[in-house]
Amino acid sequence: VDHYTYCILGDGCQMEGVSNEACSIAAHWGLGKLIALYDDNHISIDGDTDIAFTEDVDKRFEALGWHVIWVKNGNNGYDKIRAAIKEAQAVKDKPTMIKITTTIGFGSPNKSNSYSVHGSALGAKEVEATRQNLGWPYEPFHVPDDVKKHWSRHTPQGASLESEWNAKFAEYEKKYPEEAAELKSIITGELPLGWEKALPTYTPENPGDATRNLSQQNLNALAKVLPGLLGGSADLASSNMTLLKSSGDFQKNTPEERNVRFGVREHGMGAICNGIALHSPGLIPYCATFFVFTDYMRAAMRISALCEARVIYVMTHDSIGLGEDGPTHQPIEHLASFRAMPNILMLRPADGNETAGAYKVAVQNLKRPSVLALSRQKLPQLPGTSIEGVEKGGYVISDNSSGNKPDVILIGTGSELEIAAKAGEVLRKEGKGVRVVSFVSWELFDEQSKEYKESVLPSSVTARVSIEAGSTFGWGKIVGSKGKAIGIDRFGASAPAGKIYEEFGITVEAVVAAAKELI
């Protein structure tokens, strides 16, 4: 684990906002083993970069705090590039950018240094002309003997280096068995036996709390048993409740700490967490902001899903329940949009047990990220919720019917599960057979057996009401054409949480009325 990290940049990368976010914090952290090789060819898809990009990149990176090296002839100045890398490796206290000026399509007699070669193939005729121009007589995919010889020597060199490292680690393991075991678990990704026992459990007698606060309890409990758990917030730690109380801040002079201060860099934060997750199976990064601000980092979250990276996205202030901050801060379409994204778990817990269950699921899923949507407002600890239920995605928390034939099924998520439960009580007093279902994760429920899904949502029962303080988009799949989805299909408003729930019709009374219409 004493390696360097190399990053390849193009002109387009330098224009993207996320690169500035990442490069800014890399310099702040003094990441001396990060070396970026910038292919400076001044060509973009639409033409010369002069049409949109004229800044002095060298000075910008120097201002950020990077060491900057310029290789003026990148087409065949191999010795200069090699020397630049050695110089970069010698700089220990800051990252290095090596700007390598090149000609795009170098060697092509008709298309070099033109934007036509940026995103298109040369074509058979131009490939042949390029081969002749470069003096390359070999057949396609042929590797000349001198290249084979140069390349093949790296195999025994690599084996020797690996053997040396393993011997060094074996010696370290004898001297420091506990530290070695911890390091090995981070390298292999093997979870400690019984780690899930650290998750707190709750009863209805426990005081109610916002799920963001319950999330912090779970994070701190897990940090004691999962040494690879680390993360932080985009300048909202005191609101997202993501601080690990047993750790200090990860900074240039304290790299052993686990609280990461990402600053207001949502996109960069997500991208950094992807890198952490993909570096070692035993590293479990989490990052946090308000749920609505996932709009600033959605590209990184999509990459998490695409790359099968176990990143835990802790997203608080998950609905109109956040109150007076109003529609700019109130997520509406976000739950639906993440449910539409492949290979990502969207989890919306209702109380302490479900929050613990969400964290158990997030840690266990090695090949996909998880998004936890958490409330700002206080919620009760509900009867019938469980960690095991969350693992199924959807499950029954209460039911007074028999024979898997309730008169109506009320389906709630997160803060609205309480509304579903209270509406169920009202209807039962009126003699109705009511099943209340917590639907924490659509994705997990979809993965259950047909028999299990039928036991929760029997196909014979078409009287179904869903309650969620977000877009109703997609709920037709759950409630069916004869059911009713109660939600919000417009932007929110600035008002106290209780008042705004009434104004938007997300109330016990509205659920009861909808259920009666369907029965």
Curated annotation (Swiss-Prot):
Its EC number is 2.2.1.1. Its main location: plastid. Constitutively expressed in leaves and roots. The keyword GTP-binding does not apply. GO terms for biological process: pentose-phosphate shunt. Substrate binds at H118, R212, S239, H317, D325, R376. One of its GO terms (molecular function) is metal ion binding. Keywords: Calcium, Chloroplast, Magnesium, Metal-binding, Plastid, Thiamine pyrophosphate, Transferase. GO terms for cellular component: chloroplast; cytosol. It comes from the Eukaryota. Its cofactor is Mg(2+); Ca(2+); Mn(2+); Co(2+). It is an enzyme of class 2 (transferase). The record marks H118 as: Important for catalytic activity. Mg(2+) binds at D11, N41, I43. The active site is at E266. Binds 1 Mg(2+) ion per subunit. Can also utilize other divalent metal cations, such as Ca(2+), Mn(2+) and Co(2+). It is found in: Plastid, Chloroplast. It catalyses: D-sedoheptulose 7-phosphate + D-glyceraldehyde 3-phosphate = aldehydo-D-ribose 5-phosphate + D-xylulose 5-phosphate. Thiamine diphosphate binds at G12, N41, H118, E266, F293. Belongs to the transketolase family. Catalyzes the transfer of a two-carbon ketol group from a ketose donor to an aldose acceptor, via a covalent intermediate with the cofactor thiamine pyrophosphate. Homodimer. This is Transketolase, chloroplastic. It comes from Craterostigma plantagineum. The lineage of its organism: Eukaryota, Viridiplantae, Streptophyta, Embryophyta, Tracheophyta. The gene is TKT3.
